[in-house]
Amino acid sequence: MPNEQFLARQEDRRSGLRALRAALLKAHKELITLNRAEYERLYGPVPAGLFVQIVTEEPYFRWLDPLSRLIIEIDEELEAPEHHDQTCRAVAAATEKLFGPQSEPAFRERYQQALQDESGVIVAHGQLMKVIGQLKQLA
């Protein structure tokens, strides 16, 4: 039977992963909102139902795929019964890499532009960096 310290540590890790997921979702939402406005300036208004299809299929939004995949990986980890230090470190490192200078060029360029264009992206980025730091301390 797991001891209380182990269970508390597991809950800390789970909370950290949930916080990271929430911060990533916020950044994703801000980026989608910004890119929707840009897309609609170029191609005209898009109904909400069609927009979801456009985001998943249109090359204009492909640069967001690494972020979407990272969120999916965290979702899968949150479904696991236990969370390990290595996993928390790996997720924090993958997030830092994605949002850092060594990320994929297509993502980095568009993300840097979004940081310059939209205050909501800046706020989401700050929250994301804070959560990454907290998650690294748990690991």
Per-segment meaning from a language model:
Residues 1-139:
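Surface-exposed peri-terminal alpha-helical interaction modules
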